[in-house]
């Protein structure tokens, strides 16, 4: 199996875990996983497990089903022609849908409450200019789903090892007149097999970069850039 095919198989882990594939597609994926090299099969199974654990947490917090338009977004993203257009689009949309459910805290059983305003995740997913980009980060991946129109984005980190104790991952918005701007920090306890964060005020930034910084973070990047995701 070529490296390109391995990546194509790994990107199917999220829709597989969310049951967003047909029975025939599931059987085909099972055959491909069985025939894949051991590291690829292990990575696929780890991703499926992480997604299902995330959804289990969401289900424990609310009995509501995800909004219909998010389910549609997942199914649309899993179509073969869409997968060909963007290697990472399927996983990013499916993971972002899980974020939307978790952040939205939908309580459809309480009908007397007024409709809540759209969550950040919903605003990004429904934006006409929504885009996704993903890059390796250590042994895992970092994906950003973002909208310039909404000036915000969603970060999804899968299977990224936590930083060493006494350090943090620090995310930086690069570009623009102000130079690097800190967007978020994550310590050891904050990084799990499936980690999410909201990115606000993208402004004129052209990329999101990751470094490891001492203590609780730095005013400016001091560590080596571990990954850089273009936001153009």
Curated annotation (Swiss-Prot):
Name of this chain's protein: Dysfunctional anti-sigma-K factor RskA
UniProt GO MF annotations: sigma factor antagonist activity
Protein species of origin: Mycobacterium bovis (strain ATCC BAA-935 / AF2122/97)
Subcellular location, principal: membrane
Keyword Transferase (UniProt): no
Name of the gene this protein is made from: rskA
Domain of life: Bacteria
Membrane topology, Cytoplasmic segments: 1-90
Keywords: Cell membrane, Membrane, Transcription, Transcription regulation, Transmembrane, Transmembrane helix
């Amino acid at each position: 199996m070529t490296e390109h095919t391995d990546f194509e198989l790994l990107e199917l882990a999220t829709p597989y875990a969310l049951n967003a594939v047909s029975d025939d597609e599931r059987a085909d994926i099972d055959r491909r996983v069985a025939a894949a090299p051991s590291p690829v099969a292990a990575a696929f199974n780890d991703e499926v497990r992480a997604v299902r654990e995330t959804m289990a947490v969401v289900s424990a917090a609310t009995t509501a089903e995800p909004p219909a338009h998010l389910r549609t977004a997942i199914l649309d993203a899993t179509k073969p022609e869409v997968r060909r257009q963007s290697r990472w689009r399927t996983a990013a949309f499916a993971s972002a849908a899980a974020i939307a459910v978790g952040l939205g805290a939908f309580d459809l059983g309480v009908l007397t409450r007024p409709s809540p305003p759209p969550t950040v995740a919903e605003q990004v997913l429904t934006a006409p200019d929504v885009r996704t980009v993903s890059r390796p980060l250590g042994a895992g991946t970092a994906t950003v789903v973002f909208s310039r129109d909404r000036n915000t984005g969603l970060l999804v980190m899968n299977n990224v090892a936590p930083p060493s104790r006494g350090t943090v991952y620090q995310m930086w918005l690069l570009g623009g007149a102000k130079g690097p701007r800190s967007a978020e920090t994550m310590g050891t306890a904050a990084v799990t097999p499936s980690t999410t964060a909201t990115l606000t005020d993208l402004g004129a930034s052209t990329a999101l970069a990751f470094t490891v910084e001492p203590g609780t973070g730095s005013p400016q990047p001091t560590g080596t850039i571990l990954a850089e995701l273009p936001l153009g």
